[in-house]
């Protein structure tokens, strides 16, 4: 009992509401990480978050349309402000004719049996789409189709669209607002219509990133047993899982956790045969149009 009391005293809980420094509006779905540690969470729809830490830490806050903020935990008060990014958008002349379409990244739902999933810590995984001259006639993004598998109804995930830096990493948003996908229960193809957002395929290519949201609506509790044991353990996941396709190299697949971008890992021998010793790439299909 003494040990438990001492342990509890060592932990402190950060609790705050994240707002826009200019408009004072609350910011939902902010990705929050303890720098260089596997501790993190997501702000809810009201911009609220709680986070338990055992000492003074450096906390990273990342949200679409805002500058990433790095701050010491002992400086976080009841209200935390993020500064919006000012983006100068080029004038876009949009044609009324939407006669041409091109689909890239096609996948077969029936062949996918490997997924990225999320436990109790938030993370982001991204897929790079390279630009080719073929896309010149259909430069606008119309639809995003993603293979999802959810154990709860209407789980939400966030889509971030990034450019690419000199190191090949995701950097700088090409669209400065959240794009929320909603996955129905079961194995489904989730389609997001972005035709009204006027997103043009950058000539340097771009990343589509999936961000898991640590919110109550996505929480799934289950029981499982370890190999060689009959004892039932309790587990928590945050839905949905996102389907992947196998790739020969890691060049187009990145992950973001602990506040840093890293290349995807190689699948081990325990993976399905089709994925064994390959790299997992998000199963994403894009419809391009003029």
Enumerate the predicted regions with their spans.
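Bacterial Sec-dependent N-terminal signal peptides
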Residues: 1-17, 290
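Short, ordered, surface-exposed loop/turn motifs in non-cytosolic proteins
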Residues: 14, 22-36
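A short, amphipathic beta-strand motif
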Residues: 14-21, 47, 80
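A short, solvent-exposed loop/turn motif at the edges and junctions
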Residues: 34, 60-71
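Short, acidic Ser/Thr/Gly-rich low-complexity loop/linker segments typical of extracellular
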Residues: 38-48
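Extracellular beta-sheet/turn segments enriched in Thr/Pro/Gly and aliphatic residues
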Residues: 75-96, 192
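Beta-sheet-rich sandwich/jelly-roll-like modules and their strand-loop junctions
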Residues: 88-164, 211-290
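Aromatic- and Gly/Pro-enriched, solvent-exposed loop/edge beta-strand patches characteristic
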Residues: 156-230
């Amino acid at each position: 009992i003494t040990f438990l009391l001492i342990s509890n005293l060592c932990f402190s809980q950060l609790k705050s509401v994240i707002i826009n420094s200019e408009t004072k509006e609350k910011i939902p779905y902010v990705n929050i990480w303890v720098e260089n540690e596997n501790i993190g969470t997501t702000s809810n729809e009201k911009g609220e978050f709680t986070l338990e830490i055992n000492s003074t830490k450096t906390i990273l806050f990342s949200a679409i349309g805002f500058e990433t903020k790095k701050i010491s935990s002992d400086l976080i008060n009841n209200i935390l402000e993020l500064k919006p990014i000012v983006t100068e958008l080029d004038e876009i002349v949009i044609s009324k004719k939407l006669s041409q379409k091109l689909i890239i990244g096609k996948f077969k739902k029936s062949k996918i049996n490997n997924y990225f999933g999320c436990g109790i810590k938030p993370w982001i995984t991204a897929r790079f789409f390279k630009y080719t001259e073929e896309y010149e006639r259909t430069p606008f993004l119309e639809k995003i189709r993603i293979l999802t598998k959810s154990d709860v109804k209407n789980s939400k995930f966030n889509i971030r669209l990034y450019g690419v830096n000199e190191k090949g990493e995701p950097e700088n948003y090409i669209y400065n607002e959240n794009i929320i996908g909603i996955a129905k229960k079961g194995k489904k193809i989730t389609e997001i219509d972005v035709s009204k957002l006027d997103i043009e395929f950058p000539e340097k290519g771009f990343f589509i990133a999936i961000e898991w949201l640590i919110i109550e609506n996505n929480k799934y509790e289950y029981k499982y047993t370890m190999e060689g044991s009959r004892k039932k353990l309790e587990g928590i996941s945050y839905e949905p899982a996102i389907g992947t396709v196998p790739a020969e190299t890691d060049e187009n697949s990145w992950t973001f956790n602990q506040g840093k971008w890293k290349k995807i890992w190689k699948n081990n021998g325990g993976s399905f045969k089709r994925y064994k010793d390959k790299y997992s790439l998000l199963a994403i299909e894009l419809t391009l149009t003029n």
